[in-house]
C-alpha cells in the first residue's frame, strides 16, 4: 500500500513522469536489477533486468495518468492518495499505479523469500501510454529487438478485472484506426438544386455504403470488427444554403484476422464503388493501432501459467477477454513474446474519484506472487 501511495502522490499527467520512474528505479536497483532510463521527446522510459539474456518474464506498465478533470468534483484531492473506508482514492489508483506497485512489491517479496530467480526478469515502464503512445513502449520494444532481447512472456498490469482481481484477463485487443473523410460538392441556393451538388447527400450515400459492409462476427474470445461513424460536419448552418462540403469521421475496431493495410484497401474500394468522382473525396487515416492475440498453445503457454496462478489464489479460473480499448500490449506482442494483461477492477478508470478497494490490491498482489513462483527457474 505504501508503494501505491508513493506513486499516486506524484502528478504524472501524460506524458509527465513526475519522478515515478526514478523512484521505481531506485527500488529495482536495491533488488539487484540493472536499470536504464531513457528520455525521448519529453517521454520517460525505464528498462530493468537482472542480466543481458532475453528475459523469461517481463512485467510492463505505465506511470502516466489522464488529467483529473474538474477538481471540485473530487471527494479528495486527486493526487493525495487518500484512504477512505477501505478504498484508495486518487488518479492512478486503478489505471495503473496500484498495478505497478503490486508488481514491484511482489518481485521484492519473492526475492526476499526465494532469492534471485535463475531466469532473467525484466521491467518495461513508460510515461507515454495514455497519450500518443509514440515514444514509449514502442521505442523500448524496438530497442530490445535490436539487441535480440525480446522477452518470452510479458504481463501488463492494465486494469482488466470486472468485479474482482483475477476474474478477467486480456489475451489480446482489437486493432483500431480512425479516418477523416472530406466530401467536396458545390454550394448553392436550396431553391436552385440543379445548380448545386449537395455534399450532405453525398455523405449519406457514403455512410450507407460503409454501414452495409459485412465484417467478421468474431468468436467467443474475440469481438468482431465494427465500423462506427463518430462525427459529421457540413459547416455553419443556414437553412437556404446547399452545403458544398462535408466531413465524416469514423473509427474501425478490427480483429487480428485483418491487417491495417487490408482495412484501408477495403474502405477505399467501397468509396471507389460509389463513383462520386476522383476529386470529390479526400480520405486521411489517423491513429492506427495494431491488434494482437495471444493463443494457448500448450501447458507452458502464458495463458496457462496465469490461469494456474489465479486458480491457486481464488479457486476459480478467469474469463479470457479481448474487449475494451487499445493498450501497449500491441507493441509488446510479437512472434517471440506472449502477452497477457492482468490487473484490478476497471469500473472507475479515467473517472472523477477513481478508486479501488484495498482488498483487491491485496488479491492482485497474491496472484502476482503465485505467478512469479512459476518463473523462478
UniProtKB/Swiss-Prot annotation:
Entry GO MF terms: acetylornithine deacetylase activity; cobalt ion binding; succinyl-diaminopimelate desuccinylase activity; zinc ion binding
Job of this protein: Catalyzes the hydrolysis of N-succinyl-L,L-diaminopimelic acid (SDAP), forming succinate and LL-2,6-diaminopimelate (DAP), an intermediate involved in the bacterial biosynthesis of lysine and meso-diaminopimelic acid, an essential component of bacterial cell walls.
Family membership noted in the UniProt record: Belongs to the peptidase M20A family. DapE subfamily.
Gene3D superfamilies: 3.30.70.360, Zn peptidases
Organism in which the protein naturally occurs: Shewanella loihica (strain ATCC BAA-1088 / PV-4)
Record's protein name: Succinyl-diaminopimelate desuccinylase 2
Reported cofactor(s): Zn(2+); Co(2+)
Keyword Transport found: no
NCBIfam families: dapE_proteo, PRK13009.1
Reactions listed under catalytic activity: N-succinyl-(2S,6S)-2,6-diaminopimelate + H2O = (2S,6S)-2,6-diaminopimelate + succinate
Residues that hold Zn(2+) 1 according to the record: 62, 95, 158
Keywords from the UniProt entry: Amino-acid biosynthesis, Cobalt, Diaminopimelate biosynthesis, Hydrolase, Lysine biosynthesis, Metal-binding, Zinc
This protein's record includes keyword Isomerase: no
Broad class of enzyme this protein falls into: hydrolase
Summary of subunit composition and partner proteins: Homodimer.
Pfam (any one): Peptidase_M20
Domain of life per record: Bacteria
Active site: 64, 129
EC number in record: 3.5.1.18
Positions contributing to Zn(2+) 2 binding: 95, 130, 350
Pathway listed: Amino-acid biosynthesis; L-lysine biosynthesis via DAP pathway; LL-2,6-diaminopimelate from (S)-tetrahydrodipicolinate (succinylase route): step 3/3
A GO biological-process term: lysine biosynthetic process via diaminopimelate
CDD domains referenced in this protein's UniProt entry, alphabetically: M20_DapE_proteobac
Amino acid at each position: 500500500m505504501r508503494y501505491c501511495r508513493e506513486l499516486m502522490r506524484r502528478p504524472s499527467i501524460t506524458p509527465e513522469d513526475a519522478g515515478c520512474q526514478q523512484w521505481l528505479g531506485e527500488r529495482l536497483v536495491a533488488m539487484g536489477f540493472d536499470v536504464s532510463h531513457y528520455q525521448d521527446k519529453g517521454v520517460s522510459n525505464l528498462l530493468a533486468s537482472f542480466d543481458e539474456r532475453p528475459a523469461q518474464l517481463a512485467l510492463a506498465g505505465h506511470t502516466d495518468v489522464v488529467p483529473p478533470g474538474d477538481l471540485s468534483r473530487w471527494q479528495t484531492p486527486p493526487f493525495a492518495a487518500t484512504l477512505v473506508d477501505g478504498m484508495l482514492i486518487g488518479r492512478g489508483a486503478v489505471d495503473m499505479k496500484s498495478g505497478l506497485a503490486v508488481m514491484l512489491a511482489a518481485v521484492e517479496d519473492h526475492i526476499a523469500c526465494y532469492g534471485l530467480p535463475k531466469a532473467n526478469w525484466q521491467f518495461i515502464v513508460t510515461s507515454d501510454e495514455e497519450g500518443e503512445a509514440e515514444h514509449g513502449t514502442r521505442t523500448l520494444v524496438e530497442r530490445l529487438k535490436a539487441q535480440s532481447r525480446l522477452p518470452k512472456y510479458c504481463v501488463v498490469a492494465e486494469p482488466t478485472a470486472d468485479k474482482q482481481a483475477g476474474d478477467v484477463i486480456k489475451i489480446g485487443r482489437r486493432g483500431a484506426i480512425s479516418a477523416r473523410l472530406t466530401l467536396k460538392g458545390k454550394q448553392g441556393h436550396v431553391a436552385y438544386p440543379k445548380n448545386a451538388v449537395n455534399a450532405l447527400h453525398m455523405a449519406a450515400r457514403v455512410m450507407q455504403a460503409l454501414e452495409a459492409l459485412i465484417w467478421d462476427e468474431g468468436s467467443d474470445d474475440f469481438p468482431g470488427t465494427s465500423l462506427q461513424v463518430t462525427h459529421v460536419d457540413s459547416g455553419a448552418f443556414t437553412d437556404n444554403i446547399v452545403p458544398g462540403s462535408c466531413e465524416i469521421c469514423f473509427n474501425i475496431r478490427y480483429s487480428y484476422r485483418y491487417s491495417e493495410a487490408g482495412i484501408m484497401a477495403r474502405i477505399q474500394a467501397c468509396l471507389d464503388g460509389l463513383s462520386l468522382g476522383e476529386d470529390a473525396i479526400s480520405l486521411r487515416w489517423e491513429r492506427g493501432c495494431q491488434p494482437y492475440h495471444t493463443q494457448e498453445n500448450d501447458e507452458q503457454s502464458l495463458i496457462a501459467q496465469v490461469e494456474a496462478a489465479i486458480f491457486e489464489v481464488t479457486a476459480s479460473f478467469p474469463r479470457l477477454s479481448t474487449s475494451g480499448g487499445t493498450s501497449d500490449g500491441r507493441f509488446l506482442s510479437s512472434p517471440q513474446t506472449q502477452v497477457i494483461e492482468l490487473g484490478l477492477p476497471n469500473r472507475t478508470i479515467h473517472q472523477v474519484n477513481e478508486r479501488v478497494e484495498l482488498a483487491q490490491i491485496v488479491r492482485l498482489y497474491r496472484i502476482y506472487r503465485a505467478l512469479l513462483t512459476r518463473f523462478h527457474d
